Amino acid sequence: MASSATMLSSVATAACVAPAQASMVAPFVGLKSASAFPVTQKTVTGLSTLPSNGGRVQCMKVWPIVGLKKFETLSYLPTLSVESLLKQIEYLIRNGWVPCLEFSLEGFVSRDNNKSPGYYDGRYWTMWKLPMFGCTDAAQVVKEAAECKKEYPAAFIRVIGFDNVRQVQCVSFIVEKPE
């Protein structure tokens, strides 16, 4: 053990004292000239010329955070028509998910009662009746949503597709918003 330590220290001392040998490794003299590489594009000298894809890109506005709040899956699309709403509900029924209706007068998560998250901060909505187990008709779900809207006109109403085998919520989208 001691002999290997002295051997390492003597090698380290020899490496520090020994002069560099230029014949083993050539010194760095800089990058190769640009003429050695094929040039396929002209060089840009400033910001006057920017890359383009033929004019197909337009500047897109970022969604404003005040006044136009967004919700769940389909909230960035225009309001669903009755036909497209029926198609969405048929999709979740076709996948074997149970349609559920929920409503909330607030519609947004807010921490009015406490600084930590809890039950009354708006993330849990009230269920409208019971889940629609065995429902095979999308029109029945739309009828229930209209009935909920009639009773609570100032409420946000959403449809949830619940997978009762895996016990998870698979889809959720807003069907009614207050005026």
From Swiss-Prot:
RuBisCO catalyzes two reactions: the carboxylation of D-ribulose 1,5-bisphosphate, the primary event in carbon dioxide fixation, as well as the oxidative fragmentation of the pentose substrate. Both reactions occur simultaneously and in competition at the same active site. Although the small subunit is not catalytic it is essential for maximal activity. It comes from Fritillaria agrestis. HAMAP family: RuBisCO_S_bact. Belongs to the RuBisCO small chain family. GO terms for cellular component: chloroplast. SMART domains: RuBisCO_small. SUPFAM superfamilies: RuBisCO, small subunit. Keywords: Calvin cycle, Carbon dioxide fixation, Chloroplast, Photorespiration, Photosynthesis, Plastid, Transit peptide. It is found in: Plastid, Chloroplast. Its main location: plastid. The basic functional RuBisCO is composed of a large chain homodimer in a 'head-to-tail' conformation. In form I RuBisCO this homodimer is arranged in a barrel-like tetramer with the small subunits forming a tetrameric 'cap' on each end of the 'barrel'. Residues 1-58 form a transit peptide. Heterohexadecamer of 8 large and 8 small subunits. GO terms for biological process: photorespiration; reductive pentose-phosphate cycle. It holds the Pfam family RbcS. The gene is RBCS2. The keyword Transcription regulation does not apply. GO terms for molecular function: ribulose-bisphosphate carboxylase activity. This is Ribulose bisphosphate carboxylase small subunit, chloroplastic 2. It comes from the Eukaryota. InterPro entries: RuBisCO_ssu, RuBisCO_ssu_dom, RuBisCO_ssu_N, RuBisCO_ssu_sf.
